[in-house]
Amino acid sequence: MTLSTPTGLAGFDDLLSSHVVMVTGKGGVGKTTTAAALALAGVASGRRTILVEVEGRQSFSRTFGTARWDYEQREFRPGLWGMAIDPADSVYEYLDRFYGLKRVQWVMERSHALDFVTTAAPGLKDLLLLGKVYDLEIQRRSDGRRRYDLIVVDAPPTGRIVPFLQSPEGVTEIVRVGPIQRQAGSMWEMLQNPQRLRTVVVSLLEEMPVQETIEAVHALRELGVDVGPLVANQVTVPRVSEPQRDQLRDLGASGLREQVTKDGARMSGRTSQLLLDLVRTHRDQVELQERLRDELVGSCALPLLALPLMTSPTFEVPDLEVLADVLALQLGEDGPHAQARFDDTELEAAIAAARPSTVSGGTS
C-alpha cells in the first residue's frame, strides 16, 4: 500500500536525515508518544537509535515496561537504547571530565550546592541537559562510526523549547573563556546545523494547539534551528462523507426511520435522532480538522504527517508500532503493523484528513 506523501519528504532518509531529532509540542498533544513512534521507525529503518528523555517523567520506562531509566545508556529492544538525562549526573560528569573533580559529588549532594547553582544561574539546568545530548551526538565507536545513527529526544514542550535550545547562547554571553564557553559554543554549532539537529513539532488539529504550534515554529526559525516536519496527532478518521451527511440530514429522523423500516429493520425515533446527531458531530469535527490543518500548514509552510486517533482502552508498545508504521507508509516505506490494524481506506482517509490540497507545504 502507498499513501499520499507530503511534499519535501521522501522516505526515512529524508525524515530522519538529521542526527538529532528534538520532538516538542504543547502539553497533552502526544509529543512523548510521537517521539517513541519516531524512535521505533528509526529502528525499523535499520538505524541504531537512542530515545532520550530530559524531564524526569519516566514515561518511556512505563510504556515499554522496563526498569526505571537513568543516566546509563541501555539497549532495551534490539537496536533501541534509552536513557534519562538528569542535570545532577550531567554536572558531575562535566566536573570529572574537565577538572577531575568527581570526588566533589558527595560534598555537593550533602550541601545541596547543585540546587543552589542551577537556581541562581538561569539556563544552566537546560545547558546541562542539552550538553549531554551534544555529548551523545559526538560519540563515536571504535571504528570511527557514530555510536548512534539517530538520537530522538522527548524535548520540553513548546512553551519551554526556545529557552531550552537558547541556553548555550545565553551562557556564552556570560562566560567568555574556559571549557564551559567552548562547549557551549560547540553546542550552538550543533543547533544551527540541520544535518545534526532538527525539531519536529507535534500538534492536535484543535484551536489552541495549532496556534501554539504556529508560534513555536516561528520562534524556532528566529533562533536559527531547523524545523519540520509537523505531526498532526490523534486525527479523526473520516467515516462519513459530506454527501452522506447531507443525505441523512435531508431524510431527517422520521425519514431515516422509514428507510430503515423499508429495508426490513427496526429503529426507534430516539435512535434515529441520536444517529443523526452523531453523524453531524463527526462531520463537524472532520471539517474543523480540515480548516485547522490548512491554517497550520499555510502559516508554517512545512510538510505535515498524520497519526490517527487510536481507540485502544490502554496504550501499549503494539500501538506505538502501529503509529511508527503509519509514519512509514506516508513516506513510501513498509508498514505491516499499521496495515494489520487499519484497512487501506481508513488509513488513506486519516492521512488525507491532515493533507492540505492547495496550501504551501502539502500535496493532494
Predicted segments, located by residue:
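C-terminal accessory extensions appended to soluble enzyme cores
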Residues: 304-306, 314-356
